[in-house]
Amino acid sequence: CAKHSETCKNGNCCTCTQYRGKDEPMACRRGTHGQRCQCVMKIMKH
């Protein structure tokens, strides 16, 4: 599957840990470099 910030197509994104602790597929968003997988409400690790 495609990781965060990698090019995505046909919903091939990896899952991403959400703030509620559930794993959900990343959203495929169109950006300046084409469509990329993006975690929505990704848990930030410092």
Curated annotation (Swiss-Prot):
One of its GO terms (molecular function) is toxin activity. Potent toxin that may paralyze and/or kill insect pests such as H.virescens (lepidoptera), S.exigua (beet armyworm) and M.sexta (tobacco hornworm). It comes from the Eukaryota. The keyword Thylakoid does not apply. Expressed by the venom gland. It comes from Plectreurys tristis (Spider). Keywords: Disulfide bond, Neurotoxin, Secreted, Toxin. Its main location: secreted. This is U2-plectoxin-Pt1a. It is found in: Secreted.
